């Protein structure tokens, strides 16, 4: 059917995977009610009307804690497969993991020294 016969099933799956969300969006546009007045235009948060404005001061410390968390969370993702296959891996893989952990400890010490982990 196509130039690469081994990929017919994959191409069919890809077409179906692309068509399903498009079909869902088109169906929603056709079936959804068209009312644009009254209650529909009001904003709400968690089922309640908001009080005050939406612009508030956001403490940058949340951002720094989140960034440090993401860095060390990704470290866990990289170290988990190594820990699972620890018995099959040799000494070289152990040394590589130690170097990886050492680099991350240097990054943690740097963040600590710069005050990224202090809440003030």
Curated annotation (Swiss-Prot):
Record GO biological process: photosynthesis, light reaction
Keywords: Membrane, NAD, NADP, Plastoquinone, Quinone, Thylakoid, Translocase, Transmembrane, Transmembrane helix, Transport
Pfam families: Oxidored_q4
Organism: Synechococcus sp. (strain CC9605)
Assembly and binders: NDH-1 can be composed of about 15 different subunits; different subcomplexes with different compositions have been identified which probably have different functions.
Residue intervals passing through the bilayer: 6-26, 64-84, 89-109
Membrane topology, from the record: Multi-pass membrane protein
Main location: membrane
Catalysed reaction, written as an equation: a plastoquinone + NADH + (n+1) H(+)(in) = a plastoquinol + NAD(+) + n H(+)(out); a plastoquinone + NADPH + (n+1) H(+)(in) = a plastoquinol + NADP(+) + n H(+)(out)
Entry-linked Gene3D superfamilies: NADH:ubiquinone/plastoquinone oxidoreductase, chain 3
Annotated InterPro entries: NAD(P)H_OxRDtase_bac/plastid (IPR023043), NADH_UbQ/plastoQ_OxRdtase_su3 (IPR000440), NDAH_ubi_oxred_su3_sf (IPR038430)
Gene Ontology molecular function: any one: NADH dehydrogenase (ubiquinone) activity
Broad EC category: translocase
Superkingdom of origin organism: Bacteria
One Gene Ontology cellular component annotation held by this UniProt entry: NADH dehydrogenase complex
Family from the record: Belongs to the complex I subunit 3 family.
Function: NDH-1 shuttles electrons from an unknown electron donor, via FMN and iron-sulfur (Fe-S) centers, to quinones in the respiratory and/or the photosynthetic chain. The immediate electron acceptor for the enzyme in this species is believed to be plastoquinone. Couples the redox reaction to proton translocation, and thus conserves the redox energy in a proton gradient. Cyanobacterial NDH-1 also plays a role in inorganic carbon-concentration.
Designated name of the protein: NAD(P)H-quinone oxidoreductase subunit 3
Entry EC number(s): 7.1.1.-
Record localization: Cellular thylakoid membrane
